[in-house]
A protein has these predicted regions:
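Phosphate/diphosphate-binding loops
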Residues: 1-21, 35, 182
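A contiguous, well-structured pocket-lining segment that forms one wall/lid of small-molecule binding clefts
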Residues: 21-27, 31-150, 164-178
Length: 182
């Protein structure tokens, strides 16, 4: 929502995810985003993992605005590094036999619920990182079940600049016998 500004303003992404998860805010940004989504005004579907990191960073109060590309995910990673015990979170995985899709909406809902119960921000940040890593590894496992010659994985894109995520995904995939390149 909002073109380039939407990619910078993590709060906008958060409002979009929360609206889609059925959590409706009453502040002006949430109302504007909900109306834009409902009426399909200046909205583009994003499959960017970076935008999800932006939304979670805003949700946890870590970073609400990207002054430079990747700022919110970097700050979220820094927060996660403080964790001693990751909060257990996971993606809902939708697999129809042709495509595998990670549905982050239950994850967003669970983070909101955990925050309302006093969960520690750094533990939620680390839990989010672990959930993303688990989703990537599980996707690869499912793809290999469809084609047992699938044993090499290339990790690329800005999200894999995240050291926590990269190290965990490599660890999980190598433990499952994949050759991993990054």
């Amino acid at each position: 929502i909002g073109g380039n500004e939407g990619a910078r303003n993590c709060q906008t992404m958060l409002c979009a995810y929360m609206d889609q998860a059925g959590i409706h805010g009453d502040d002006e940004t949430a109302k504007t985003v909900a109306a834009a989504l409902k009426n399909d005004i200046n909205t583009v579907t994003s499959t960017s993992m970076g935008r999800l990191f932006d939304a979670v960073s805003a949700l946890l109060g870590v970073c609400r605005y990207n002054d430079y590309e990747g700022e919110a995910p970097i700050e979220l990673e820094n927060e996660a590094m403080k964790s001693e015990e990751p909060y257990p979170l996971n993606f809902e995985i939708e697999d129809d036999g042709e495509s595998i899709i990670g549905n982050p909406l239950p994850l967003i809902y669970n983070i909101v619920e955990a925050r309302s119960k006093g969960a520690v921000v750094c533990d939620l940040a680390m839990g989010f990182h672990m959930a993303v890593a688990d989703f990537v590894a599980e996707t690869c496992r499912r793809l290999r079940k469809r084609d047992d010659s699938f044993d090499q994985v290339v990790l690329s894109g800005g999200t894999f600049q995240n050291r926590i995520l990269l190290e965990r995904v490599v660890e999980l995939l190598e433990a499952d016998g994949f050759s991993v390149y990054f």
